[in-house]
Amino acid sequence: EYISANPTGPLHVGHGRWAALGDATARVMRHAGYDVFEEFYINDAGTQMDNFGESVAVRYQQLLGRDVEMPEACYAGSYVKDIAQTIIDEDGDKWLDADPKERMENFREGAYAYELAEQHRVTERFGTTFGCWFSERSLYVPDEDGLSAVDRSLKAMDEKGYIYVEDGATWFRSSAFDDEKDRVLIKANGEMTYFMSDVAYHYNKMERGFDHLINIWGADHHGY
């Protein structure tokens, strides 16, 4: 797994480094006789996606003459204006007086599709191809037994005694594996953490039969 950028903006130079390293590693291992599968993990769940949709909604209104301020948590890059302009070119002012929640959700999914297509285009131009673009959202979709990948991974960890509840939150005993601290899986308010998604994703990889997992991550994952 490598690159795995959020679909909330263009790929940057760091992603290019990870693409070069990941692709080269896969090619060398494949040449050495390994059966290698390359995957891009799409971080398409969580509040950053709502913030992205709201960012486009604000730029859309501004481009149509509304005096609307960009919230602090939103994305201010010029590419957001480009996406908003694309919506104007297609829909005009259709969304200007729409229900704010409906507008944000529509723009979120539209902006997501736009940026994901851009990421596909850039990686293909770079010469990097993936066997799978894996959606984080799919980890929360129940199977025929009514259990999602998140549910199954929690069950597996619980059976091995690796999780506990403290102050209303569910924790993973990662310190038992030489981590610097235990990690929260589910917050006290019931919200899943990014780490929970990461655990479920890796559990899903093992369910699919992979026996050796290689991750190329950014510095923000150093603690993992």
Regions found by a protein language model. Give the residues of each.
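NTP-dependent nucleotidyl-transfer catalytic core
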Residues: 1-224
